Amino acid sequence: MYYNAFNTSNSFVNKNAQISMNIGDSLHLKVINNDTITHGFDIKWTTGLSNTIASGDSIEITFSSQNIGSYIYYDPLNYPNNAYVGLSGIIAVGSNSNSYFWNIKDHQLTWNDSIANGNNVNWSNYYPDYFTINGQSNPNINLDTTARVTGFVGDTILIYMANTGQAEHSIHFHGYHCNILFSSYKPSHVGRSKDTFPVKIMESYVLMLIPDKPGEYPVHDHNLLSVTGGGLYPFGMFLTLLIQ
């Protein structure tokens, strides 16, 4: 499958760089375009940061936030194609070291190669068949220590979640409820306690989990198509929480 990503070195991995910063800090980023075509860089819900980067060129930006948040950085050129094939990740703003990150995506396998070849796709006919968290699906996602939540009863755990795909998802927790600390789509929902979180396209949450009991509990997309890979179950957006 054709895939791009923002990486921290010249070695390609299919997991976008996870950027974390404290509230009030200034983040200085240098973004280098190692591709053969022009790309862009922007951070959602900010102004004045959008840039175009020619092949072999680079840009530098400074970003800060005075509030907790899960910001999406992405390539806005030829949107949504470049972001869809992988160029979209999370900037987590907060002050909790016990934090986890879920960058959720969906793909229609044949479309990735079609976009790579410069062909047009009709997004009204989009029907994804592969689903990932941080570039992995079940069972491999449980090996990602930045995604798989582990902890103890009474811990304060933050989960930064962003939907950087092109389909809506509904992430459901078994065993626990989470409090909403940040919602890009519905800021009025901050403070609510829920076990299911609808995530619109290119929107995000920060969730706070304080486990009240030990156990291993699943988290998955309530749209069960997203718990498959190539039509096979159980793959896709499914992982477990492990609380002691």
Model-derived features with residue positions:
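Short, catalytically relevant binding-site loops at active-site mouths
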Residues: 108-111, 165-167, 177-178
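Intrinsic, low-complexity N-terminal interaction/targeting segments
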Residues: 179-197
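Generic beta-strand/beta-sheet core signal
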Residues: 105, 162, 172-174, 222
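Hydrophobic beta-strand segments within beta-rich accessory/binding domains
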Residues: 29-31, 75, 160, 171
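N-terminal, post-signal-peptide metal-ligating segments of extracellular/periplasmic oxidoreductases
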Residues: 1-39, 45-48, 60, 93-94, ...
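Extracellular/periplasmic metallocenter environments
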Residues: 36-40, 45-100, 108-110, 196-244
